[in-house]
Regions:
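Glyoxalase I/VOC metalloenzyme domain signal
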Residues: 2, 27-30, 135, 152-156
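Conserved, surface-exposed functional patches that form binding/active-site neighborhoods
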Residues: 105, 110-143
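N-terminal strand-loop-strand beta-hairpin
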Residues: 1-10, 14-120, 161-191
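A short, polar/proline- and glycine-enriched secondary-structure boundary/capping micro-motif
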Residues: 77-83, 135-136, 146-148
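Residues forming well-ordered secondary-structure scaffolds
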Residues: 94, 111, 132, 149-156
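Short capping loops/turns at secondary-structure boundaries
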Residues: 20, 88, 127-130, 143-151
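Mixed-charge, glycine-accented linear interaction segment located at domain edges/termini
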Residues: 145-169
Length: 191
């Protein structure tokens, strides 16, 4: 999604939601009802590497393929804009080993993702190993479009899904795991 926009892409990353507060299973039928695509089931194993200029992660998929993703996103509360570059790989295991030796691992996140496409928004229903269930909204911004347009679109979608502002939490999964003292060596495959 959005790969035809050139090597550097812009996304608006919306809020994260905690299932204990909002009932993830109740959101699934609502997401299905408004989606043009999905559900698409994806297993993702993300290894984050030490990187001074942003974040770099290797995303391995269950079918043996992967993507090296470098991105920059502000460390601020609430919705944020993200700039990133993707590079596909057919050898994620070997690439993980090389990057781990060169840069060191900063964390690892393993998740089962159920993806829905609603217009230009990716709706992620995630089951994250050692963390729980979450919902994330990711709005693809067009060239020259303001982040505020992404915020407005995310808020409209939140209303359709029955999500309230009080149910939002901040932070990337790797940061939430780190806050709990769970780092790369504690990661395992989902059951």
């Amino acid at each position: 999604l959005g790969r035809n926009q050139g090597p550097c892409l812009r996304h608006f990353h919306g809020p994260w939601l905690c299932p204990a507060a909002f009932g993830l299973r109740r959101r699934l039928p609502k997401a299905k009802a408004i989606a043009s695509e999905g559900p698409i089931e994806i297993f993702q194993d993300d290894t984050f590497f030490n990187c001074e200029n942003g974040r770099m992660k290797l995303r391995a998929f269950s079918e043996g393929k992967g993507e090296l993703i470098f991105y920059r996103r502000a460390n601020q509360r609430g919705p944020k804009e993200s700039f990133y570059v993707l590079s596909p790989t057919s050898s994620p295991g070997t690439l993980r080993e090389a990057l781990s030796q060169a840069y060191g691992q900063a964390g690892r996140v393993e998740k089962h993702r159920t993806l829905f496409i609603v217009g230009r928004t990716r709706v992620h229903l995630d089951q994250v190993k050692n963390l729980g269930h979450f919902l994330e909204l990711e709005v693809v911004l067009q060239e020259g479009e303001s982040p505020e347009a992404g915020v407005q679109e995310a808020h409209k979608l939140m209303a359709k899904l029955g999500v309230e502002q009080s149910q939002l939490i901040d932070g990337a999964y790797v940061d939430l795991l780190s806050q709990r003292g769970l780092h790369a060596q504690n990661a395992g495959c989902p059951e």
